[in-house]
Amino acid sequence: MKTFDSQAENSPAVIGRSLRNRPLARKKLSEMVEEELEQMIRRKEFGEGEQLPSERELMAFFNVGRPSVREALAALKRKGLVQINNGERARVSRPSADTIIGELSGMAKDFLAHPGGIAHFEQLRLFFESSLVRYAAENATDAQIDLLAKALEINSQSLDDNALFIRSDVDFHRVLAEIPGNPIFKAIHVALLDWLIAARPTVPDRELYEHNSVSYQQHIAIVDAIRQRDPDAADRALQTHLNSVSATWHALGQQSKRKK
């Protein structure tokens, strides 16, 4: 029986033979075009707002077909490096926070579908918004607190309309996310709520009315604590609220499964 020689296995000759047996995957033409155009944009050969050459000109320049050019431009659009409008040449743009977060959307939705995925995202939301309310209690201006109060008022007017209440609920929490003035916070928050709401079960409206009223009262407690400049109280109020929301939707989801 042959003995295993780790030094022989790791010798350059053996590694070299192994690599020769594993040919590198060739890049698609569209990927090569994408990379070259991206580098040209980053080198400022095409400035922000400037149009790229036409598809026909790009085909001639890179010596590729139209599908390769279109795939490359579509990839650059997903990265936020170009904007594409029907009938116009692609125009160079600057990636935004929304673009960055949007790239994660597909992976996030896949993760939500895994066992425990929703609970993990709810915990992420709790950690994130906990920091937001503490910041708001310590730093929000009077004008920002007034915006929270206006969002709360709209919240109160939509208790009997579930679709409107969900929108006003999201708007209330969005105002919280905007208080630090960081566009990345806002983009993360918008995406996080979109992902969680999309993952919620479909339930009859009548089962949500009581939940709406409870959420509204909890929103009041959050705003009151922020007005009092009490970050600990604001954090407790928020955690009570989000834990209640999670428990309610978990219970509604279980009911929905039993009825099927």
Curated annotation (Swiss-Prot):
Residues in a coiled coil are none
Q: Which InterPro entries match?
A: GntR_C (IPR011711), TF_FadR/GntR_C (IPR008920), Tscrpt_reg_HTH_GntR (IPR000524), Tscrpt_reg_NanR (IPR023730), WH-like_DNA-bd_sf (IPR036388), WH_DNA-bd_sf (IPR036390)
PROSITE patterns xrefs: HTH_GNTR
Q: Does the keyword Transcription apply?
A: yes
Any single GO BP term:
negative regulation of DNA-templated transcription
**Could you tell me which residue ranges the HTH gntR-type domain spans?**
27-95
Which family does the similarity line name?
Belongs to the NanR family.
Q: Which organism is it from?
A: Citrobacter rodentium (strain ICC168) (Citrobacter freundii biotype 4280)
Entry keywords, A to Z: DNA-binding, Repressor, Transcription, Transcription regulation
* Family annotation (HAMAP family): HTH_NanR
Q: Which domain of life is it from?
A: Bacteria
Name-wise, this protein is HTH-type transcriptional repressor NanR
| Functional summary from the UniProt entry | Transcriptional repressor that controls expression of the genes required for the catabolism of sialic acids.
Keyword hit for Repressor: yes
Q: Which residues bind DNA?
A: 55-74
SUPFAM superfamilies given in the database record? GntR ligand-binding domain-like, Winged helix' DNA-binding domain
Q: Which GO terms describe its molecular function?
A: DNA binding; DNA-binding transcription factor activity
Pfam families noted in UniProt: FCD, GntR
